[in-house]
Amino acid sequence: MEHLLAGLNRAQHEAVTATEGYVRVIAGAGSGKTRALSHRFAYLVNELGILPGNILCVTFTNKSANEMRQRIHALTGDNDTGYINTFHGFCVSVLQGDSHAVQYPKSFLVLDNSDIDAMLGIIYEERGLTLRDMTYSAARDMIEIRKLFKEPEYYKDMITMSLDTLREKYERADTAGDIIFYGYLYQEKKCFGLDYNDLIKFSLYIFEQHEDIRLKWQQRLEYIMIDEFQDIDALQYELMEVLCGYHGNLFIVGDPDQTIYTWRGANVKYLLDFDKVFPNVQTIMMMENYRSTPEILAAANSLIAKNGHRIKKDLLPTKPSGEKVVCHFADTQEAEAQWMAGEMQRLHDRGVPLRDMTVLYRAHYVTRAVEEALMHEKIPYTIYSGVQFFDRMEIKDALSYLRMIAYQDDLSFRRIANAPKRNLGKRRMAFLQETAEKEGTSLYVTLKNHLEDSVFSGTKAKQFVDLIERFSHSYQGRPISEVLSDILDKSGYEKALRTEGSQERLDDLAELKQSIYEYETSCGEESTMEHYLAHIALFSNGDVAEQGDKVKLMTVHAAKGLEFPYVFLCGMNEGIFPSRKVRTLPGMEEERRLAFVALTRAEKGLYLSEADGWNFDGSPRYPSRFLLDIDRELLSFTHEVDETLLREAADDVARRDKYLREDDGDGTLPIGQRVRHAVFGEGTVLDVDLNKGAHVIQFDGMGTPRSISLRAKLEKIGP
């Protein structure tokens, strides 16, 4: 026993040895909760003699589950590590054992997004739907919303209805929403497929309808432990209630200050109200932080204290003092990135490995300037959970349009001739390739010379050639940023992204345009198209080594649960972090919790930065409210603070706050929602502009989007 309890602090010791009944652990960031969970599992097995197969330990990611298994195996020496899994993974075990109860085979399919999109493709083709009716992304969201909220009993149709009856229901559907929803249920049943929502719903159905199966699992699971309880949703909570109903041994761990997934249905009230729901709950506060210096924790505590709806608690430092949190105000994104690269180089010169440095950000599009600065300084880096800026599909497509205008080369032609779709598929491209080789011409020239051939009838080949010809004869002397905006509009490329609902890709294109504008400003007369394309090739040749000592770049969401010696949190501006898409006060508190998560990833050094300049919509960019939230004496500023800038930033925050609602209500509409306006007719919501207090709507009968006040009356069409 001694080796399992050795080195544990008082709270950890209490958590490990409190084995019976209902136990809630409020565990702050870096407080050693994973250590407590793994040692508790080992304590149950090694000291109490509980069989591993009678313990359920739930984590929220497969990666966490694998790491937990490894830790427990090292402590117990037993290859049987019980049910250490995600909720969905556990439900797969239930269904594989008792799938006969829902008339499904043991070999059912677990569907991912690509499977769902393939099913949507079949439905759209069968019923003549297009992406104008609903994008795949919007369709997936609609299906999930209907399954969770609007038609939560849907699974009974899947289980009890015959395939023919489901097919008839699908065929009778006459609105896009119903066609897609019932078509999807039919396709699921047809291939015995279950998505993530189905896994829990089907398991709950089995437990509800078959007492013998429910009792079997309840009796088997003598001890249940759940990590990251602040991220649990209603279905997972219901499943947990069922499973612990026999033995009553439930151990939960969570931190209300790290609730960052409410957009996925997480509800922190399950953690906060745990002692009101279950009897004789023992609550353990695990606040000693073993990760960060006192200076980093002081800044994080100061930030999160500004949230009103929380358990008032502070992380307690255990590490010796370090340096103050550094805060840098830059004039431009480029200057911010150059400062970061310089600080990294200074750290590296002091002997800090590059792999100990991590750049965190709220959204991927802010990495462009950072990547350029790192490459310029020859600092190798790698992006986690994302693609390097100049390797992203939409950036490569946009640059290929510019190359087509300037060079009309085959590589660019292959990339964008059918982007957006012009019906120039594999067969016609093969014809072009073969003909080009015979005639000794480029693919583009070959297409120009053969536009009248029957093989190109029914395509938009002529429109494409006309587009390239028009731009190639007129681009010289025009600003490159203007040419790019123009061709992305005239080609229909940006419109196609809007139709798909690809807001992140549109943000990336806006960032590219901004970077070109800044390039033009800095280069003056040298800023020709050819010069720019040669310059940008240096940033997109992928010549950074894949292995070795590299800086890590990742979103804050991707960094959850991780820790890094030195953290650079960039893009700390209103509209970036917090996101411009936040519409409610609870949503703003979640953004602040996300910032808290970012700050508490740092072990030794934390660098916060923002950049002045202009937002995509032309409005001035101000420092984030989260920088203003932190007590100034806790920060080390790199230069004298501009008090006027901070006053203007505070005024900007106050102005934005006027548009934040108390709850989620119906004040704004989701992106992709179809609406009807009394004068303009039907259209699609493209975005919500909180700066203007408006929906951005593309009306069907208009060539360009319109900003419509949030207060204007709009009728929702469909789900």
PLM region spans:
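Conserved helicase motor core of SF1/SF2 NTP-dependent helicases
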Residues: 31, 230-309, 313-318, 437, ...
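ATP-hydrolysis module of ASCE/P-loop NTPase motor domains
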Residues: 18-19, 24, 79-82, 100-198, ...
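P-loop NTPase Walker
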Residues: 1-106, 110, 191, 215, ...
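C-terminal accessory regions
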Residues: 571-704, 710-719
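Short alpha-helix plus adjacent loop in nuclease-associated cores
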Residues: 90-99, 257-262, 291, 384-406
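Conserved helicase C-terminal RecA-like lobe
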Residues: 170, 353, 367-379, 392, ...
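Helicase P-loop NTPase motor core
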Residues: 25, 31-37, 279-282, 287-380, ...
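Conserved helicase NTPase motor core
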Residues: 6-17, 21-26, 36, 56, ...
